[in-house]
From Swiss-Prot:
Lineage: Eukaryota, Fungi, Dikarya, Ascomycota, Saccharomycotina
Species annotation: Pichia angusta
Protein's name according to its UniProt entry: ATP synthase subunit 5, mitochondrial
Similarity-based family: Belongs to the ATPase delta chain family.
Function statement: Mitochondrial membrane ATP synthase (F(1)F(0) ATP synthase or Complex V) produces ATP from ADP in the presence of a proton gradient across the membrane which is generated by electron transport complexes of the respiratory chain. F-type ATP synthases consist of two structural domains, F(1) - containing the extramembraneous catalytic core, and F(0) - containing the membrane proton channel, linked together by a central stalk and a peripheral stalk.
Primary residence: mitochondrion
Amino acid sequence: ASAAPIKPPVQLFGLDGTYATALFSASAKDSSIEKTFQSVQKLSSTISKDAKVAQVLSNPALSLNSRKEVVSVLSKELKLEPVVSNLLTVLAENNRLSLFDSIAKQFSVLNDAYNGVVEATVVSAKPLDSKILNRLTKSITNSKYVGPGKTLKIKNEVDPEILGGLIVEVADKSVDLSLASKVNKLNKVLSETI
């Protein structure tokens, strides 16, 4: 009797999410999630660095045989894990190789969740320096949003429209401490009293 399948740690939606979930399940069966993740990263890196590879993968006019040949060459050259090669073959057969980049991003989400990594996004009007990011990391790591045994991965996004302050998003929670939201609340109160 085979072991029970490992359930993906988070539910993903959309076609790219479906493919990423299938890739995760297949690699979990082989106990090769980490190797699969490395293969996916290697291919993503190749696509982002080599414009010709990116162009070929996103060309819907390629014949099925040409797409399969591209998959075969990439698999051999990059020494991709068999589950990643199989995914590419399925994508080639369905003329969906252009989805690989978004599938890779979704697979990264699954891999992070599987490894206990919680992603936080901090939106600020200007880029934050490392001292502030370290304080935020420490503060968020010790909060109820991360939990024991989890690792925090923090990302700083810049949006000048928030004027100042921060918007912190951890998992599915969001705290808006931006100057723009305070101004909007003040405007709303003022317009209601007039």
